[in-house]
């Protein structure tokens, strides 16, 4: 249940009561396992609206969604689509080889960690940022190029918040808990 910690909520209430009211007492369930977060993001990208079914099917087939089980399944994963299968296999190999790992990512600045994650097939900036926030618990990862963030800002604060200047002002005001 992170990164929405008590200090983050307290900061949000003090600097942005309008957003605090919109968020309310929301609690967000975030994936804590790196590979599971990668796999969910990859399957979600490949299955889109059918994600819940596709994820349940993958979990049922593998028993446990882990890099080892993905590699064991190998070509059978093509039932989920060739692109998704290649992406899952690549992510599994990267995690098992240490190319992508919690310790390595935790040691990198946000932009570099995003770059490492985006080097994997089917991992885009938005998924990489979700992993930084959810798995690595980075409390202040906000990007102007994230349309979902800008859309939410516009709903709460109006169109001016979506300009580069408005976004940067928002980000500065909410630091160090911008992700919350």
Regions found by a protein language model. Give the residues of each.
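Catalytic DNA-binding helix-loop module of base-excision-repair DNA glycosylases/AP lyases
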Residues: 43, 109-155
């Amino acid at each position: 249940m992170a990164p929405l910690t008590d200090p983050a909520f307290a900061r949000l209430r003090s600097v942005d009561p309008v957003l605090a009211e919109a968020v309310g007492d929301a609690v967000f369930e975030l994936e804590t396992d790196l590979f599971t977060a990668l796999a969910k993001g990859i399957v979600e990208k490949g299955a889109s609206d059918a994600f819940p079914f596709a994820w349940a099917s993958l979990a049922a087939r593998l028993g446990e969604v882990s890099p080892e089980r993905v590699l064991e399944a190998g070509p059978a994963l093509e039932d989920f689509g060739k692109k998704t299968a290649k992406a899952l296999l690549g992510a599994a190999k990267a995690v098992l080889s240490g190319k992508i790992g919690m310790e390595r990512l935790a040691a990198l600045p946000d932009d570099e960690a995003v770059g490492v994650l985006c080097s994997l097939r089917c991992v885009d900036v938005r998924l990489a940022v979700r992993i930084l926030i959810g798995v690595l618990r980075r409390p202040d990862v906000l990007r102007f190029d994230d349309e979902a963030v800008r859309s939410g800002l516009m709903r709460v604060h109006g169109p001016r918040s979506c300009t580069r200047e408005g976004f940067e002002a928002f980000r500065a005001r909410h630091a160090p808990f911008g992700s919350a």
